[in-house]
């Protein structure tokens, strides 16, 4: 159940901030807009090299209403989902599973004690 490197950050912004946000991360930080799986809602993935390090999602409400402001979640690559599932259940941590069809990844979402959403990504064998 070891956790690996940080995979990406997800930034939640209002629709009015899309242009400025994309311009900032692409023009100033040098990220490149690239492939994003179909999730049924608008958003962008920005890449550093061949890795999507920043995910941008939209919300109509003010992005600072939650306990973490605009910071939506942190995602980490991980291994041994059965072991982690046992650990989460043993500690009474509620979680959600989501299979991303476009790229064979099992995503697990749960919250830390501060309300920050954490995502663990488990790469599935093809």
Residue ranges and their predicted role:
Residues 2-5, 10-12, 44-47, 56, ...:
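Conserved N-terminal glycine/acidic-rich loop preference
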Residues 35-38, 72, 98-100:
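Short beta-strand
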């Amino acid at each position: 159940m070891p956790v690996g490197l940080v995979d990406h950050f997800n930034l939640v912004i209002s629709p009015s901030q899309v242009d400025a946000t994309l311009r900032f991360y692409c023009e100033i930080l040098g990220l490149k807009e690239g492939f994003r799986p179909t999730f049924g809602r608008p958003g962008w993935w920005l890449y550093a090299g061949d890795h999507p390090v920043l995910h941008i999602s939209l919300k109509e409400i003010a992005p600072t209403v939650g306990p973490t402001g605009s910071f939506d979640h942190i995602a980490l690559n991980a291994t041994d989902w059965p072991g982690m599932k046992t650990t989460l259940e043993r500690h009474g941590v509620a979680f959600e599973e989501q299979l991303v069809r476009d790229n064979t990844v099992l995503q697990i979402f749960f919250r830390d004690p501060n309300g920050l959403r954490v995502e663990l990504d488990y790469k599935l064998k093809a």
